[in-house]
């Protein structure tokens, strides 16, 4: 039995953290549990701690004084980033002691911050380190210099990687570093499909955008595109919350929706958007930069929505445009307006896309990803036991 400890720097319910919850739950509830025993360590408290525990996953919070919010990608100078990295190293030393005490066989880092901490911890515990990459390591997100350094860091300290899409994997430029792709899928075996409300006439449509309210998710682009649509929907739901320091963007969106006279309801964060998706005619994913994967796209397909999503990025691996949904270029307001017009006005097209989308969603079963991850981690532990220095190369 391989004991795998997953590490996260935050316990806030964002995309990567929810994906990890689904993955570990799938491991525990499938045949993968016969070869892999997962546990979770957070370096701060938050809602995900109880969410993990509720699924029967061994979960702990490492006591420390470091505030992960003090180190941000955007708006931070190099001196502040260096100070933050130093703090992460200190937390990593404590993490190593805890991991060694718990007898973990492999450490899985779920973010760049977690990678820095886990590099120290894995070294101290003398176990392999796997980088679970949920973000594209690209200039558009991290900046060119920092993206380059993160790639180098990953190759130096990680024995292998798990990427959440081909798009994410390509941004790593992993070279000879071993790795696998494990999509952040959905639980098709433990949760039944929900019934979807029949697609409505054009003037009665309901549109939803699901995702954290942050600028790169493009909710402002969506509102402007919708304002130019020939037929306005009956109702629009913006589903998603904000993290520390992001509240002003929600205010901007509320003001914009009011200015454009759009029928928008802001729901805030929802642990499970299924009820809204079940009554939504059109789900719009509108990120303005390449999305690493886009879990909500698969959720919308499964729910029976007609989906519009942006490319490049993970959604282009999920949707064949015109078959399972429609793809538009990220940040292109004109293309998004045209796609909205096409779907709002063509109810039959919405029905066809929604039916094909439900079938397509089944290709992203989290049980399959659990098997992929279980086999990969077992292989990496076996490699390390025979070649202790494997993976420590650029």
What are these regions (language model features)?
Residues 306-309:
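Short hydrophobic beta-strand element within catalytic cores of glycosyltransferases
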